[in-house]
Amino acid sequence: MKRKLPVDVFSDWAINGKDVGMEKNHKLSVDNMIEFSIKKLDYFTFLDAGCGNGWVVRKVSKLNKCIKSIGIDGSQKMIEKAKSIDKKNKYYCEDLLNWKPKNKIDLVHSMEVFYYFKNPKKLIKHIYSSWLKKNSRLIIGIDYYYENKISHSWPNECGISIMSLFSEKKWKNFFFDVGFKEIKTWKVGETKKWSGTLVITGIK
């Protein structure tokens, strides 16, 4: 199988409807991350990095505390789908490594995105410097990581050309090296064969 770039694979998923399953498969982890992130917030602005069809953007926008909910994704097809479903919130088709929001954000969330970059630390640094307000939070969830052995076959199974495999410690160090404080990691949805979603978060 010829491997494709992540953005091309996800565009295919948007066309064939595979994006719908992402909400079902990731709901438990996303709910956990959002609940943790907003419990001490009053009103907040929210950005979903790698938003796909916008399901998390829509979900968070319905919360009373949320004053703005934004989605960004590199896949034109995913953004077209998000905009067709949701006329209320803003969506941008952009390269995450270069894009900057007009106004900095209180909470940046991402589920199953960062390991599709050759150098995830570069993206984490860009978000820290250009997206986040002071004392605001980045929280990410990933299923493809070293300790989750069952995930190691995914690059071949999915035919994706860029998937960067790192340990929990390495991901935590990325946040530390960039300058985040109050860094925490935990896992959601562990079973005997599945190590769960690895959550990493920190405060700017």
Report residues per predicted region.
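Conserved class I S-adenosyl-L-methionine
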Residues: 1-39, 146-147
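Class I SAM-dependent methyltransferase SAM/SAH-binding core
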Residues: 47-49, 53-98
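A conserved beta-strand element that flanks and buttresses the S-adenosyl-L-methionine
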Residues: 109
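A short glycine-rich, Lys/Arg-flanked "PGG" loop and its adjoining helix->strand segment in the class I
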Residues: 121-134
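Conserved beta-strand signature within the Rossmann-like core of class I S-adenosyl-L-methionine
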Residues: 135-143
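Short, glycine-/aromatic-enriched active-site segment of Class I SAM-dependent methyltransferases
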Residues: 143-162
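Short alpha-helix
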Residues: 163-178
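Core SAM-dependent methyltransferase catalytic element
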Residues: 187-204
